[in-house]
């Protein structure tokens, strides 16, 4: 069911999103700040909006209406808590009068500065309101705003990693990447190498060394690492902004389609057969003996016996 939902989402986005250049951006933050968002999970709800508003603000100054979709991620390859945002933005948008399509570019350095300031301000303002829970690792050192700033100020002086991928001529690459990236579980079954009832061993890619490494932990630690990434019920992992927001897309997307000479198509229906053909190269309704088409005849339900 999860695979079908993922492919259905990808198919829908590929048909709805405008055919234009896209820029994929990954917003990260220093590891020293991750625990603040683990201890204050309600703040995760604001991160996508902060990331999107940075680009919306830049575009607004140029009188251009852009489209954005984002995805929140909380885990690294080794299942540790690692908060970051994946964002795709159109490299063009509607002019102020909504009559023409204008090109726009974003600068990595200024984007990083605005993201860094916004996150630091978020933590400071939340603390001033008395709503910030201090992570366990900082409880012995943070007792007032001044001591909090002793933690935040050095991080503000650092260069934060905001990655700009190579621009894509179409949204398909970003949609396929984000769809499978967000909809999949934190750890693919293929990466699990060993389990003996007490110990779990899995493989992961170390981004620093660029090599695959093995991670060994107890069963309890593995479960703890895994369940920390379960989002709150109804939490929106993927969000839309600008002309892709649900508030504006109904009015603006038809205009954009006309300007880009694009004819939107009805998303392809994802079925059990299409998934089997795509990933298993097998038609489930073809007889393995004679090659004839199988015909559905009846469905039998398992009987429940009373005890």
Model-derived segments and spans:
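Beta->alpha loop/short-helix hinge microenvironment recognizer with preference
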Residues: 1-307
């Amino acid at each position: 069911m999860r695979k079908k939902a993922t492919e259905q989402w990808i198919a829908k986005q590929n048909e709805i999103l405008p055919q234009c250049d896209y820029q994929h951006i990954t917003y990260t933050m220093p590891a020293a700040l991750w625990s603040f968002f683990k201890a204050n999970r309600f703040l995760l709800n604001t991160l996508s909006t902060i990331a999107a508003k940075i680009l919306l603000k830049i575009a607004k100054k140029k009188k251009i209406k852009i489209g954005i979709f984002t995805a929140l991620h909380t885990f690294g390859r080794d299942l540790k808590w690692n908060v970051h945002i994946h964002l795709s933005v159109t490299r063009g948008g509607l002019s102020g009068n909504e009559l023409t399509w204008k090109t726009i570019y974003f600068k990595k350095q200024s984007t990083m500065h605005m993201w860094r300031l916004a996150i630091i301000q978020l933590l400071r303002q939340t603390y001033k309101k008395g709503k910030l829970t201090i992570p366990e690792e900082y409880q012995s050192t943070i007792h007032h705003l001044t001591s909090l700033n002793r933690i935040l100020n050095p991080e503000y002086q650092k260069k934060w990693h905001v990655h700009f991928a190579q621009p894509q001529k179409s949204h398909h690459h970003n949609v396929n990447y984000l769809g499978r990236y967000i909809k999949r579980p934190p750890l693919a079954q293929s990466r699990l190498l060993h389990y003996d009832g007490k110990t779990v061993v899995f493989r992961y890619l170390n981004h620093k060394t660029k090599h695959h490494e093995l991670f060994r932990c107890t069963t309890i630690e593995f479960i703890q690492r895994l369940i920390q990434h379960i989002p709150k019920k109804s939490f929106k992992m993927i969000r839309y902004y600008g002309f892709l927001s649900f508030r504006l897309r109904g009015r603006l997307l038809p205009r954009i389609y006309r300007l880009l000479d694009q004819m939107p198509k009805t998303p392809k229906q994802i079925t059990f057969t299409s998934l089997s053909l795509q990933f298993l190269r097998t038609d489930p309704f073809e007889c393995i003996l004679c090659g004839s088409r199988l015909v559905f005849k009846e469905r039998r339900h398992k009987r429940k016996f009373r005890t």
